[in-house]
Regions:
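Bacterial N-terminal signal peptides
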Residues: 8-20
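Short aromatic-glycine-enriched beta-strand elements
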Residues: 123
Length: 238
């Protein structure tokens, strides 16, 4: 069970390792989109995340860079929604963000962590959970719930490979996000990349100078392979 949860958590971080693919992208009766409502970190967090990402790439050049196709972000909610209702989803999320005003918050990053998928691991910068973050997530869940559907197919995700790069575990993760990654299980973080477990253990053993930052905005993304924020659907105005 623990190993299963670790693999599922790795998908949530933004990059899974060694997972089964779902063949083909079967059509659904009504188009569905897999979305990630995310906070965009400010320059302070982005600089820290990119610096850490560069360290990981020096150790493991086959990893991924934080760039236009791997946006540094803090996932608040991942769901399947009806594509025809996307504008309603954007409006509902915007209303919540306008009320909460997350760009006025100060958040604290306090450690690295990684999810093992031996011999590799997916690393992130962990953000201290706050009542504000929990409240925002709760409100987003309520606001988007009328437009959600239980599950989706690979066609719901951004793919340049006809859906063949979409993992079955990823579909399950998005389907069960509220149960498995919200509330007491919410672990706010910014993914920084992938490296060997040996390197990550050494990295985590070093002191982590905590720092503060603020959200600079928010967006709705279409999820891609391994849960990456691949395509911005709407920039929100918190």
């Amino acid at each position: 069970m623990r190993e299963h949860l670790e693999v599922i958590s790795a998908i949530g971080l933004g990059l899974g390792l060694a997972m089964a693919f779902v063949p083909g992208a079967a059509a659904q009766s009504s188009p569905v989109t897999a979305i990630d409502i995310a906070l965009e970190p400010d320059a302070t967090m982005i600089d820290h995340a990119k610096a850490a990402n560069e360290r990981l790439l020096q150790s493991f050049p086959k990893g991924f860079s934080l760039d236009e196709t791997h946006h540094p972000h803090i996932s608040m909610l991942q769901q399947f929604v009806r594509t025809d209702d996307l504008d309603k989803v954007f409006a509902a999320a915007n209303a919540v963000l306008a009320n909460e005003k997350p760009t006025t918050w100060t958040l604290k990053a306090f450690k690295y962590y990684y999810i093992p998928a031996a011999p590799m691991g997916v690393a992130g910068i962990v953000i201290e959970p706050t009542p504000d973050l929990h409240r925002l997530q709760d409100e987003l869940i309520k606001a988007v719930e009328p437009y959600t559907v239980k599950t989706g197919t690979p066609a719901a995700f951004f793919s340049e490979d006809g859906g063949r790069d979409i993992q079955g575990q990823l579909i399950s993760y998005v389907e069960n996000f509220v149960r498995d990654a919200a509330g007491k299980r919410f672990n706010p973080h910014v993914t920084i990349g992938v490296a060997t477990e040996k390197f990550l253990k050494e990295m985590l053993a070093q002191p982590f100078p905590s720092f503060t930052f603020s959200p600079a905005g928010a967006s709705v993304y279409q999820l891609g392979s391994f849960g990456t924020a691949r395509k911005e659907l709407k920039a929100l105005t918190p």
